[in-house]
Amino acid sequence: MSRHFLASLIATMALLSHSISGYTQDTSSAIVISNARIFDGVSEQLIEGKQLLIEDGIITALSEEVRIPEGAMQIDAGGRVLTPGFIDSHAHLMLQLSFGEGFNSDAYYWAYVSTQAAEIYLQNGFTTVRDVSGNSFSLKKAIDRGIVDGPRVFPSGPMISQTSGHSDHRTDAQASAMVADEPAVPMKYDMVQLADGRTEVLKATREALRRGASQIKIAVGGGTGSYADPLDTTQYTPDEIRAAVEAAEDWNTYVTAHVYN
C-alpha cells in the first residue's frame, strides 16, 4: 500500500465521523485502526485482517499486528470499509447561500456558513477540495491553523469574468460598472471579480495569486447562476484568456474555466 494516501482515512459508514474530526489539523499523535476492510483506491479486492498505523499524517505500517505507539488513538472499525480520503475537484465552500439569503447577509455570515460547509465536507470523507470561485483564503488559513475543522483547501479565489459575464451579479437597479457605485454583494465580498481587457485581467489574476490562489478560475461562457448572460454566449476574447494564462504560468500554475458553450 502506498504511503502517499491522504492522511485522514474516512470510513464510508461514518466510522470516524466523531473520532477523527479535526485530524487534518492535529496529525502529531498516532492512530491505529483495526478490524477494517480497506479499499486502497487501486485494487477491487478489499484488504482484510490488517492493522493500519498513521503517524504524523502518514501511513507508516500495514500488517497483521503493527507496533502501537504510546498514547496512540485506537479505533476498532467493526468490519466497516475504510477508504482513502475523497477529493472534490470542483467545490464552492464560500458559496453556500441562496441568492436571496446571500444578497441580504454580511460577510461575517457568509464566513460562518462556510465553516459549517467545510466540516460537512470532512465528515463526509472529503479530505481535499479544489475551491473554484469564492473568497476562501481565510477559510483555508483557519483550517490549516486548526481553528476550524475542514479539508485541505486549494483556493482559486474569486472567479474572474468580463462585464456582463458569469461573475456579473448586478441587478438592473444598480448603476453601470463604468461609474462609481456600490458593487453587487458577491463582488463586494470578493467572491467574484469583473475584469475587462488584458490589463484588468492581468491585474485580477495577479491579485488572486497574491492572496494565495493555487490556481485561477475564469468564466468564458454563460451560466444559470447569472441572469444577464445566456448560456450560449462566448465570454472573453482570446487575448484576455491568454493574459490570465500568462500570469498564472508566471507563478507555475494554471487556469481553470467555467465553460458552457
Question: Where does each model-flagged region fall?
Answer:
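Metal-associated gating/positioning segment near the N- to mid-region
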Residues: R80-R145, T163-A173, D239
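Divalent metal-coordination and catalytic microenvironments
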Residues: A36, L52, G57, G79, ...
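Positively charged n-region of N-terminal signal peptides that target proteins for export
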Residues: M1-F5
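Bacterial N-terminal signal peptides
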Residues: A7-S21
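Extracytoplasmic/secreted proteins, especially bacterial periplasmic and envelope-associated proteins
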Residues: I54, A61, V113-I120, G134, ...
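Histidine-rich, glycine-flanked metal-binding segment
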Residues: D26, I38, S43-T83
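Cleaved targeting-peptide boundary
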Residues: Y23-A30
